[in-house]
Amino acid sequence: MSSTAVDQVFLKGLKFETVVGPDAWHRPTKSQPIEVDIVLTPTNGLDAAAQDDNVSYTIDYGKLYKQLVASVSKQSFENVHHLSQVIRASLPEARAFGVHVRLPKGVLAADGGVTFGWESHASVSDGIAEITQTMIIKGIACRCIVGLNPHERVEKQKLEVSIHIQGVENRLSPAILAGVSMDTVSDLSTPAYQAVANSVVERVEGSSYETVEALATAICQLVTINHGFDNARVTIDKPYAIAGVFAAGVTIGRSKAYFENKDFWKIKRT
């Protein structure tokens, strides 16, 4: 790999307040805070700019910032996917790009909000750029019985659940922008992220497990089988498991096929 392949220009933490589909209270026309990160890999790297100390040979992030503000400000968007399309249309030519949009208050049940990402990379075989799309719901607050110790079997303890979903960007964007539900197409930026978070809380509350591994796997099953995603990676933090650490926990990733080919157990209830 060329040394210039890792050269990047970025903007972090662009803050806007606009309509990007339903807010956490499911109101379709209410503005909400959004945070945007942009990463660009320049087509010819940054060598020329470094050698000549000349900004004309690089991507001017000052101009990029002004262009993004002009494109996004004073607009409303049907959903986050629509916003990402407008942002990506504003980007200069680059070898690769990454766009991440965070809704810090987009989900009532998730203290860490929800983040959507779009990253391009060229196929090794044909050179055609493919866009990987991710959705991360962070810090879903839950309480349940989980653990082997006697005291853990008596009282529910607080858990923080984060869900990471990844796939190739859906090609049916006209249908998505028309409001087709997650049950019809698997785009990751529809308001189904709220339904995912709420269903996790509903299932976990009142459940009982001896291991956090079993609980995380059960949540993977819920996200893939019930919500139709091809894969899910679930992280569970147990802040009160060990007094001397901030949190203990696990991360488990499973595909929908994993559960389709075996008789996995249901959510265990107390």
Residue locations for each model-derived region?
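N-terminal, polar/charged subdomain of small-to-medium soluble alpha/beta proteins
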Residues: 1-270
